[in-house]
C-alpha cells in the first residue's frame, strides 16, 4: 500500500503546492482521491498512466477538488489508438451524479456517455468491498454534501482522507486507529473559517481518533504562518507523528 500526495495546496494557485489530489495504490490498483487542476499531469509524474484508472473518488464538488474530472473523461475518450473497454467508476457524495449532469449541460452529452463504460455512484455512509481492499465513507461538515474516505488493505494497513471538513465526530469515528490520517488544515487558529480546520482542531481530531500518523494538507497562504502553528501547537495536543504535506510526498507500507 502506497500513498502519494499529488497536490498539497488549496484553491489558491501556488508555485509551491498543487491543487488537492491524493493517490493510494493498493495491490497495484491506483486509487485517486480528488483531482484539482493539474492532477492528471502529476499522476503521470508519479508514474501512473491515466488509462490504468478504474476507480476515482471525490470528497465534494468544489472546483479545487474536481476540476480535472472532465479532462480525465475526455482523455479516456479521445486518446489516439486507445479504445477503452474497462468501466470507469466515479464516486462522490450525495448529489454528485446530479452535479455531473449539470456539467454535461455545458460540456455536452458525451460527458455522460463517452465511448466506454462509465458509472457515477453517490455515497453517504457506505462500505465498499473489493478483492484486496475496502473503502468506508462518512459524511463530514463542509459543503452541502461532503464525505471522507477510509481505505483498508487486506494486509491490515489503513489511510483516512478527510477532504474539506470542519471539526466533527464523523471524521473522528471514521479515522479511529487509522495508520495515516490526512486532514485539511486551511487556516491558523485565530482565523477559523466555518467548514475548515485549524492546527488545534486538526490535532484534536487526531488525538481523539488515536491515529498513528497525522498529515496536514490544504494550507492557505501564507503557508509559513500555519506551518509555524502546526509545529508549535499540534504536538501539545497529539502525541503521534505529525507531517506537513508537500507535493509528491510518498509513504509506503512494506508488509
Spans of features found by a protein language model:
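Metallo-beta-lactamase
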Residues: 87-145, 247, 254
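Conserved beta-strand hairpin/beta-sheet module of binuclear metal-dependent hydrolase folds
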Residues: 1-46, 147-163, 180
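Active-site neighborhood of phospho(di)ester-bond hydrolases with catalytic His/Asp-centered motifs
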Residues: 32-36, 54-60, 93, 159-163, ...
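Active-site metal-binding motif and surrounding structural segment of the metallo-beta-lactamase
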Residues: 38-89, 179
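Divalent metal-coordination and catalytic microenvironments
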Residues: 3, 22, 34, 43, ...
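P-loop/Walker A phosphate-binding loop and immediately adjacent motor/lid segment at beta-alpha junctions
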Residues: 72, 76-89, 143-147, 152-153, ...
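Adenine-nucleotide cofactor-binding loop residues
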Residues: 36, 141, 166
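Cap/insert and terminal regions of metallo-dependent hydrolase folds
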Residues: 167-250
